[in-house]
């Protein structure tokens, strides 16, 4: 079954420990350093819209883009109470096309790693560049190859009321892809329903992504550790990138 099909309906409960506010706060710190004050933004691979909603509540006009219709359904439901909710669009990132330019593009929670073909990743970054206004900024994070390799052979459990998930990691050195076989159990009344999804992430290196950003035309490329300023440390599990489009002087 496709990734984020059945999982979409339990995703927020299984990830209730994710601090989206802290992630957006780090974006804001980066933008403050770069002198960017966005009025418009796109949240790439937005999932159930948690980051998009935080940005929208700050008065930013937001578009959320994701490949999963089920995740976008949940995002729309969460946005119903907002006076100016994000607009949500179902698109693959390598075919990203927005009706107008934006000042900020973000891609949270290692979602870029889900692009399994490096050529598609390169094209996605080009599309992001074209979607940004001059002086705009692109901020995203990825899992490091070290982290994805460490997942090989590991078994993980996540649970909340009425939902239970067990997943197993397997890293393939030939393809550079980490696969997660995920068994999901969701309860409806007295009945438990089981489904299976496979999630995969490509282990992009820091140099590889830096090259893609440069080739797309980005400048002022910076790489940070996990929600902290300063270069990534040895063994870092997540790193952040920020890059600018043609700063207007």
Where are the model-predicted features located?
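Residues lining the SAM
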Residues: 108-110
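C-terminal lobe and adjacent flexible extensions of AdoMet/dcAdoMet transferase-like proteins
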Residues: 202, 206-249
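Class I SAM-dependent methyltransferase SAM/SAH-binding core
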Residues: 42, 49-95
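Conserved class I S-adenosyl-L-methionine
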Residues: 1-37
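SAM-dependent methyltransferase
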Residues: 139-210
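A short glycine-rich, Lys/Arg-flanked "PGG" loop and its adjoining helix->strand segment in the class I
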Residues: 122-134
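A short acidic, Gly/Pro-enriched loop at the edge of an enzyme's catalytic core
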Residues: 97-104
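A short His-aromatic
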Residues: 113-115
């Amino acid at each position: 079954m496709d990734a984020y099909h059945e999982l979409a309906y339990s995703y927020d409960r299984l990830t209730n420990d994710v601090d989206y506010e802290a992630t957006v706060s780090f974006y804001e710190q980066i933008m403050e350093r770069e002198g960017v004050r966005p009025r418009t933004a796109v949240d790439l691979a937005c999932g159930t819209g948690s980051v998009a909603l935080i940005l929208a509540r700050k008065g930013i006009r937001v578009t959320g883009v994701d490949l999963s219709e089920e995740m976008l359904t949940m995002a729309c439901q969460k946005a119903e109470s907002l006076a100016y909710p994000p607009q949500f669009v179902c698109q693959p990132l390598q075919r990203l096309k927005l009706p107008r330019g934006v000042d900020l593009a973000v891609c949270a929670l290692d979602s870029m790693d889900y692009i399994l073909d490096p050529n598609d990743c390169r094209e996605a970054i080009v599309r992001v560049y074209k979607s940004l206004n001059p002086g705009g900024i692109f901020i995203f994070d990825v899992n490091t190859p070290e982290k994805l390799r460490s997942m090989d052979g590991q078994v993980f459990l996540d649970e909340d009321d009425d939902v239970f998930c067990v997943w197993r990691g397997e890293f393939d050195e030939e393809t550079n892809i980490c696969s997660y076989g995920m068994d999901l159990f969701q309860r409806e009344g007295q009945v438990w329903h089981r489904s299976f999804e496979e999630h995969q992430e490509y282990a992009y290196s820091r140099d590889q992504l830096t090259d893609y950003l440069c080739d797309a035309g980005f400048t002022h490329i910076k790489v940070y550790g996990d929600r902290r300023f300063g270069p990534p440390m040895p063994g870092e599990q997540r790193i952040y990138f920020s890059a600018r489009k043609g700063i207007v002087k």
